[in-house]
């Protein structure tokens, strides 16, 4: 137990919060990486599906697992992608999303609504 004098001189150190997206660093909203593996995985109970995910190697950090949103994709090994933060609630360990329509990942085909989220240009 510290004395009053020790508390006046030093004070108490605040708690440091754990980062939710450590791979993005302090001030990067997105980062570029290279896909090392593209595969499907199953979600936690009570959901049932085959979710598309990719292992992405980020220089200066390591490998992370990122979710591929939307229907269909053209990703394969060695594709260069842009990742952003944002977890997938029913996939344990998936804390990042891959941005559609940026770098090697195409936008979703035949998408009419919410196009900006899926990297689709306005047609016509």
UniProtKB/Swiss-Prot annotation:
Task of the protein: With S4 and S5 plays an important role in translational accuracy. Interacts with and stabilizes bases of the 16S rRNA that are involved in tRNA selection in the A site and with the mRNA backbone. Located at the interface of the 30S and 50S subunits, it traverses the body of the 30S subunit contacting proteins on the other side and probably holding the rRNA structure together. The combined cluster of proteins S8, S12 and S17 appears to hold together the shoulder and platform of the 30S subunit.
A cellular-component GO term for this protein: small ribosomal subunit
Signal peptide (residue range): none
Keywords: Methylation, Ribonucleoprotein, Ribosomal protein, RNA-binding, rRNA-binding, tRNA-binding
Subunit structure, interactors included: Part of the 30S ribosomal subunit. Contacts proteins S8 and S17. May interact with IF1 in the 30S initiation complex.
CDD domains: Ribosomal_S12
Gene transcribed to yield this protein: rpsL
Swiss-Prot/TrEMBL GO biological process terms: translation
Family named by the database record: Belongs to the universal ribosomal protein uS12 family.
Residue positions, PTM 3-methylthioaspartic acid: 90
One MF annotation (Gene Ontology) recorded for this entry: tRNA binding
UniProt name for this protein: Small ribosomal subunit protein uS12
